[in-house]
UniProtKB/Swiss-Prot annotation:
Sample GO molecular function, one term: DNA binding
Pfam families listed in its UniProt record: HTH_1, LysR_substrate
Name of this chain's protein: HTH-type transcriptional regulator PcaQ
Gene name tied to this protein: pcaQ
GO CC entries: cytosol
DNA-binding region boundaries: 23-42
Record bears the keyword Ubl conjugation: no
Record keyword Protein transport present: no
Keyword annotations from UniProtKB, A to Z: Activator, DNA-binding, Transcription, Transcription regulation
Ranges for domain HTH lysR-type: 6-63
Length: 311
């Protein structure tokens, strides 16, 4: 039986602190004072008999008890949000909202066609599609702000409480503008990599560690001109006006390469291949509109790759 001392405000406050990794930022978002947030967390810890948060330098981190509680608190918040939505939808005769986090590789390559297929179903559901780093999107999925994340499979330690469905596999590519000097026959890309600015995924991105390991394995421990970014808009614009090299998931630039605007350098990147697919919370059942969108994404991926395993 649920302890009657645990109120909605306890769950809401804890989930927000966990999401922001900061009592101060959580207080700002909840429009309450910092002491009020601290007091609410302490009340919750007293009821549970464990510490949910721990000091880490000048900040805080979630304890192992907090991680366990967050999974269930997030599920509770999601269920409550769905209950509220269902009443609103019944009154408005609209479908439940669908909130999707899409990594850049699928935002460009898969989602446009999938969305066209979904809209043809006429569910009446409002749709929100956001993009960003995988870690951020998974955190939003965990606490119920998103219903689905579409992108590369995250590291095992990040997938606790989630279910992943593989759609296809995709490599990382070394991309440059058309006419780049390194496209000349016979040149070794790795021998000349240090001569150019290199756009890299951030270390927090899902392909960041993959790229780092690949470079080290190929004798490139450090780059003198390194720019970390997850902005595909910046990457495209910068490559068009410079000799920079962009290390990025193939799907992000597939259309640019097909149009002849960008070109792929002759680097064998098979070791960077990784699964791309659908990630959902393991403890919730998708609504009918979400199920329809997931099927539309499967069909869009199937049409694009036609049975192939490499993107």
């Amino acid at each position: 039986m649920v302890d009657q001392r645990i109120k909605f405000r306890h769950l809401q406050t804890f989930v927000e602190v966990a999401r922001q990794k900061s009592v101060i930022r959580a207080a700002e978002i909840l429009h309450v004072s910092q002491p009020a947030v601290t007091k609410t967390i302490r009340e919750l810890e007293d009821v549970l008999g464990v510490s949910l948060l721990e000091r880490e330098g000048r900040g805080i981190r979630i304890s192992r008890y907090g991680e366990v509680f967050l999974r269930h608190a997030g599920a509770t918040m999601t269920a409550l949000r769905q209950a509220v939505d269902s009443v609103s939808q019944e009154a408005a005769r609209a479908g439940p909202p669908v909130r999707v986090g899409a990594l850049p590789t699928v935002s460009v390559r898969i989602m446009p066609k999938a969305m066209s297929g979904f809209l043809a179903e006429k569910t009446g559901s409002p749709v929100k599609i956001v993009t960003g780093e995988n870690a951020v999107l998974l955190e939003q999925l965990r606490v119920g702000d998103l219903d689905l994340v579409v992108g590369r499979l995250a590291a095992p330690q990040k997938m606790a409480g989630f279910s992943f469905e593989h759609l296809y596999s995709e490599k990382v590519r070394f991309v440059v503008r058309a006419g780049h000097p390194l496209l000349s026959p016979g040149l070794s890309v790795f021998d000349h990599l240090h001569e150019y600015p290199v756009l890299m995924p951030t270390r927090q991105s899902v392909i960041g560690p993959v790229v780092e390991q690949f470079l080290i394995a190929n004798g490139v421990p450090a780059l003198p001109i390194r720019i970390e970014t997850v902005s595909d808009a910046f990457g495209r614009a910068f490559l068009r006006t410079s000799d920079a090299i962009w290390i990025i998931s193939e799907g992000v630039v597939a259309a640019d390469v097909a149009d002849g605007i960008l070109a792929i350098l002759p680097v064998e990147t098979g070791d960077t291949s990784g699964p791309v697919g659908l990630t959902v919370r393991a403890d919730t059942q998708p609504s009918l509109p979400l199920s329809l969108l997931m099927q539309a994404i499967r069909e869009a991926a199937g049409e694009l790759f036609d049975g192939r395993t490499e993107g």
